[in-house]
Amino acid sequence: MPLNREDKQAVVAEVAAQVAKAQTVVLAEYRGIAVGDLTTLRAKAREQKVYLRVLKNTLARRAVEGTPFAPLAEQMTGPLIYGISEDAIAAAKVVNDFSKSNDKLVIKAGSYDGKVMDKAGVQALASIPSREELLSKLLFVMQAPVSGFARALAALAEKKQAEAA
């Protein structure tokens, strides 16, 4: 069923609101993908707080107009699913991980920090560890010298007790 003018304006406003707070937009071609697979992708996207939607390209172009994602409009051709996220890597990671297991989902382009990326750029962005992973690695690196020092002190205390006995 075709959308009337008010419905189209509502869709553009909704997507424009998502794009306004987004850091990353990823476009992927979904030609021939099964409904069950698309449902799985949407569930994974929801878990990662990624706005995932199939849109008419004309409406998507209107939504990104005047934003840092405007140069991405040139890539908006064919049947596309749009992944939009506030997290810098979440949309790229969700779409890239799913495209590895489903060859019908093909990453077409993406945009981050006002720059348009090709498929390789989106895959590179997806390979970056998440913020939580980076923080845990940093904590481990900071904690290692302290725990080593504590073990050395414990060994020294044991040695002193052994000498005293």
Swiss-Prot record:
<keyword id="KW-0687">Ribonucleoprotein</keyword>
<dbReference type="Pfam" id="PF00466">
    <property type="entry name" value="Ribosomal_L10"/>
</dbReference>
<comment type="function">
    <text>Forms part of the ribosomal stalk, playing a central role in the interaction of the ribosome with GTP-bound translation factors.</text>
</comment>
<keyword id="KW-0699">rRNA-binding</keyword>
<comment type="similarity">
    <text>Belongs to the universal ribosomal protein uL10 family.</text>
</comment>
<dbReference type="InterPro" id="IPR047865">
    <property type="entry name" value="Ribosomal_uL10_bac_type"/>
</dbReference>
<keyword id="KW-0689">Ribosomal protein</keyword>
<keyword id="KW-0694">RNA-binding</keyword>
<dbReference type="GO" id="GO:0005840">
    <property type="term" value="C:ribosome"/>
</dbReference>
<dbReference type="GO" id="GO:0070180">
    <property type="term" value="F:large ribosomal subunit rRNA binding"/>
</dbReference>
<dbReference type="InterPro" id="IPR043141">
    <property type="entry name" value="Ribosomal_uL10-like_sf"/>
</dbReference>
<dbReference type="GO" id="GO:1990904">
    <property type="term" value="C:ribonucleoprotein complex"/>
</dbReference>
<protein>
    <recommendedName>
        <fullName>Large ribosomal subunit protein uL10</fullName>
    </recommendedName>
</protein>
<comment type="subunit">
    <text>Part of the ribosomal stalk of the 50S ribosomal subunit. The N-terminus interacts with L11 and the large rRNA to form the base of the stalk. The C-terminus forms an elongated spine to which L12 dimers bind in a sequential fashion forming a multimeric L10(L12)X complex.</text>
</comment>
<dbReference type="InterPro" id="IPR022973">
    <property type="entry name" value="Ribosomal_uL10_bac"/>
</dbReference>
<dbReference type="GO" id="GO:0006412">
    <property type="term" value="P:translation"/>
</dbReference>
<dbReference type="InterPro" id="IPR001790">
    <property type="entry name" value="Ribosomal_uL10"/>
</dbReference>
